[in-house]
Amino acid sequence: ETEGGIETKPEDVYLTDGASPGIKLFLNLLISHHLHGVMIPIPQYPLYSAAISQFGGTQVNYYLSEENNWAIDMDSVEKSYKEAVDKGIMVKAFVVINPGNPTGQVMTLENMQKIIEFCYKHNLVLMADEVYQENIYGEVPFTPFRKALDTMSEEIKKGLILVTFFSVSKGFYGECGKRGGFFRMVNVGEFEKEQIYKLSSVNLCSNVVGQNCVELIVNRPKEGDESYPLFKQEK
């Protein structure tokens, strides 16, 4: 419900020790051959290139436009995808970091819709790293990809596989050492959910302190609560 006020089913949310374990879980799930590719932005957060290498996949770069405030250039994205396919690479997923890391840009809704259309057209899992959603300093507001998906056609809304990632390490809280986070799945099939459950079970469960932090952040003080004035001041 934190993602744009859209209803969330408990079975579609997994608590993790920060965002990184969830990201690595999905990359591990998607990559089973050296010709399995994952599209990642350049510049990027090094976790993605390292994890793709760790799991034996192929990194497929797409380049952000520095001249256009580090926006995603869809012509460049299509070119990168085509070049990868021509080399025999089976592209499985598309990673987007919004707000950007390390670039800091916030994507417009129009740009997000184009990415959603691209992923749907090419049957790619859209992995949206949204851990910096509360570190916004410009004029463009943050829109969750889950909310952007809701603006699309019924066919795309029901057909695109989307996974979003959240962490207590960022935002105004910045609790890096607590290791709390979660990922949320949209349109993931039952068979795939079974595999995700198995992979997640290997780690038993996320740590309790991190879980507590997630609960406090998603159920933060609301207007009218006794603690709200102090919360607003410190935020």
Positions of PLM-derived features:
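Conserved core segment of the aminotransferase class I/II
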Residues: 54, 147-235
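Internal amphipathic alpha-helical segments of the cytochrome P450 catalytic fold
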Residues: 23, 49, 88, 128, ...
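Conserved core of the PLP fold type I
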Residues: 1-118, 127, 133-155, 164
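Residue-level detector of transmembrane insertion/anchoring sites
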Residues: 119-120, 160
